[in-house]
């Protein structure tokens, strides 16, 4: 049997713990050391100076000396910085840096400086000492303020400069008797910190100028609303900057009326400005803030009252006095409201004058009349009275209805030659009739044949009352027909409305009618129901909400891709239509413009050159003294002219 691993016999042999004790025997005759006393008791006194600590004491003393020196240097540096800051911000300092250092000896610099912007104590401004420079900077610095703070022991006072509060000792106290209680900047800061800034500015404005700011302006709720005229009240402007405001604002405005008054807040500027282009309130505020170095929160910006006679009179009277500086021409609304006669006329509105204006300008649509008449309110007293009226919608409807009646009656009394002459007088000179002739030749139409057909067409000769332009697509049929329709101010009818009983109602008020792109179903309808209309004979037309009216159908121009004369489905149309074929496509230049220009001026030149050919030289029995085919229409009473 094998022996067990490891060692056996626990605690025996060399495998356990054992104790070794050295035994020294002193023998007789051994030499004893001189510095060792064998019989003396060991007290440990020989180890007292074993470690030399003199070096540590010297280092500690040096550190304490350096700390004290550092404190003194820091106090002196703080005093110098305080002196520079007080001089920079206009504060007077009466204590030397040595006194400030002595007062701070008991405190460390970190304990002396405490940031306390919103200090609850009373803040007072130090006396401003004149500096060698002129002014501080372009941006006005915050005034230095002093806060007197009494602690529980009553041995410390503080002064605040800008946003930092630095405690000073009793020896460095400022002279409280020489402190000015208020200053323009402090007042302005109070304005900025007030709960209702606008109310404070309104009150100050009324106190200075003697009237409310709201008496001069109207209110824009949105800051994005654009206007060219603005009234601004700017508070707390530096006097030097205020003197140059007239020169600074001149490149941006067409008119400027500037007034400046001094108060405890500084200079308050009241200005009426007319900019070269429309601006909103935000843009105006940014521009003025850049020029005057005043935040936009210290400004009142609103548009002026354009219809207030009192406000206009204020600007007019103050503009003539020496308290205002005026640049540019006076706005028209001030001139208009300061004329006595105009002010009297504004109170009376004359509907007949409005109708006469709409008639002279060929306006029959209610929307067009309302918009155009409102635009001339600055120069027309009756239009201004119309805008002030509470019955604008009623007046507008009555004006449009009466104008249409007058226009309809006038047109009915005019023959075709008179109407063409009237239209030619309305169009500018400078046209050329050759493009029309060249286009007809390009399409293979004989010019003399076309003139003969056009003469019968304009006279409304029976069986010759309708011209048809037929041919493939894109040959210029609609282009040619629409240009003639526009010149003669005709009307368009569409077969898509043929299911309505009133689709022919436009024929009652026009000298010419056009139906564009007639299809087979349209020709079938004409062959069934419109034979008399194509003949040029009287027909009965149904009108909406009105009784039937009997009229002679005006000349009708029709375009189509189908030739109705060659089609056997409509045999009764052959003798009632004058057909001209347009087989060639309309040519365009490289800019996609028609090669043959056909417009109102060219048609005017065409009718003037072919006037005799078309037999339009009828004797005008009703011509007035100016040579017009009829007398000028007047629906307003004339005024007697008093001669000298």
Curated annotation (Swiss-Prot):
Modified residues (Phosphoserine): 92, 96
DNA-binding among keywords: yes
Major localization class: host cell
Top-level lineage group: Viruses
The entry's keywords: ATP-binding, DNA replication, DNA-binding, Early protein, Helicase, Host nucleus, Hydrolase, Isomerase, Isopeptide bond, Nucleotide-binding, Phosphoprotein, Ubl conjugation
Domain SF3 helicase: 445-595
Region (DNA-binding region) residue spans: 180-346
InterPro entries: Helicase_SF3_DNA-vir (IPR014015), P-loop_NTPase (IPR027417), PPV_DNA_helicase_E1_C (IPR001177), PPV_DNA_helicase_E1_N (IPR014000), PPV_E1_DBD (IPR046832), PPV_E1_DBD_sf (IPR046935), Rep_E1_papillomaV (IPR016393), Znf_lg_T-Ag_D1_dom_sf (IPR037102)
Subcellular location: Host nucleus
Chain location of the short sequence motif Nuclear localization signal per the record: 86-88
EC number: 5.6.2.4
PTM characteristics: Phosphorylated.
Any one Pfam family match given in the protein's UniProt record, by short name: PPV_E1_DBD
Gene3D superfamilies, per the entry: 3.40.1310.10, P-loop containing nucleotide triphosphate hydrolases, Zinc finger, large T-antigen D1 domain
Family to which this protein belongs: Belongs to the papillomaviridae E1 protein family.
Reported function: ATP-dependent DNA 3'-5' helicase required for initiation of viral DNA replication. It forms a complex with the viral E2 protein. The E1-E2 complex binds to the replication origin which contains binding sites for both proteins. During the initial step, a dimer of E1 interacts with a dimer of protein E2 leading to a complex that binds the viral origin of replication with high specificity. Then, a second dimer of E1 displaces the E2 dimer in an ATP-dependent manner to form the E1 tetramer.
Name of the featured protein: Replication protein E1
């Amino acid at each position: 049997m094998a022996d067990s691993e490891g060692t056996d016999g626990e605690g025996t042999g060399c495998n356990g713990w054992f104790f070794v004790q050295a035994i020294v025997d002193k023998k007789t005759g051994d030499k004893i050391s001189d510095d060792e006393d064998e019989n003396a008791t060991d007290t440990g006194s020989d180890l007292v100076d074993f470690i030399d600590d003199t070096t540590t004491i010297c280092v500690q003393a040096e550190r304490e000396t350096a700390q004290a020196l550092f404190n003194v240097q820091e106090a002196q540096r703080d005093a110098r910085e305080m002196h520079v800051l007080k001089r920079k911000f206009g504060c007077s300092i009466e204590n030397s840096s040595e006194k400030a250092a002595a007062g701070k000896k008991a405190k460390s610099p970190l304990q002396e400086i405490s940031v306390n912007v919103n200090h609850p104590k009373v803040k007072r401004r130090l006396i401003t000492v004149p500096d060698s420079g002129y002014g501080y900077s372009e941006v006005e610095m915050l005034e230095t303020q002093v806060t007197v703070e009494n602690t529980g022991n009553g041995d410390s006072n503080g002064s605040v400069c800008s946003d930092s509060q630095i405690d000073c000792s009793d020896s460095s106290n400022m002279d409280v008797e020489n402190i000015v209680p208020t200053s323009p900047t402090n007042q302005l800061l109070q304005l900025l910190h007030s709960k209702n800034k606008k109310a404070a500015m309104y009150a100050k404005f009324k106190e200075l100028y003697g009237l409310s700011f709201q008496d001069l302006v109207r209110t824009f709720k949105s800051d994005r609303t654009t206007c060219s005229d603005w009234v601004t009240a700017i508070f707390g402007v530096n006097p030097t900057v205020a003197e140059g405001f007239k020169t600074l604002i001149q490149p941006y405005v067409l008119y400027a009326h500037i007034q400046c008054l001094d108060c405890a807040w500084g200079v308050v500027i009241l200005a009426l400005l007319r900019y070269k282009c429309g601006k909103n309130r935000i843009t105006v505020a940014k521009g003025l803030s850049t020029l005057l170095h005043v935040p936009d929160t210290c400004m009142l910006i609103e548009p002026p009252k354009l219809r207030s006679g009192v406000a206009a009179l204020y600007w007019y009277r103050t503009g003539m006095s020496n308290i205002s500086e005026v640049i540019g021409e006076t706005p028209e609304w001030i001139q208009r409201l300061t004329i006595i006669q105009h002010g009297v006329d504004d109170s009376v509105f004359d509907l007949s004058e409005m109708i006469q204006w709409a008639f002279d300008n060929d306006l029959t649509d209610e929307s067009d009349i309302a918009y155009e008449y409102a635009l001339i309110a600055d120069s027309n007293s009756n239009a201004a009275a119309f805008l002030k009226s509470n019955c604008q919608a009623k007046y507008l409807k009555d004006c449009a209805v009466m104008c249409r009646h007058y226009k309809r009656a006038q047109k009915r009394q005019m023959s075709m030659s008179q109407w063409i002459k009237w239209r030619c007088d309305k169009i500018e000179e400078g046209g050329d009739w050759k493009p029309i002739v060249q286009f007809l030749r390009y399409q293979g139409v004989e010019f003399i044949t076309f003139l003969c057909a056009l003469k019968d067409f304009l006279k409304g000769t029976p069986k010759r009352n309708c011209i048809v332009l037929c041919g493939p697509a894109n040959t210029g049929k609609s282009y040619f027909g629409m240009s003639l329709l526009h010149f003669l101010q005709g009307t368009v009818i569409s077969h898509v409305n043929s299911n309505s009983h009133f689709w022919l109602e436009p024929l009652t008020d026009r000298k010419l009618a056009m139906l564009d792109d007639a299809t087979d179903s349209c020709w079938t309808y004409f062959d069934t129901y419109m034979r008399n209309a194509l003949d040029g004979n009287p027909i009965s037309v149904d009108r909406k909400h009105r009784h039937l009216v009997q009229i002679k159908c005006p000349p009708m121009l029709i375009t189509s891709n189908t030739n109705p004369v060659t089609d056997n489905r409509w045999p009764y149309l052959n003798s009632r239509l004058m057909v001209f074929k347009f087989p060639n496509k309309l040519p365009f230049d490289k800019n996609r413009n028609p090669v043959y220009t056909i417009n109102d001026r060219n048609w005017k030149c065409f009718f003037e050159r072919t006037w005799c050919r078309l037999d339009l030289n009828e004797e005008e029995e009703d011509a007035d003294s100016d040579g017009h085919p009829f007398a000028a229409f007047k629906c307003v009473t004339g005024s007697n002219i008093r001669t000298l």
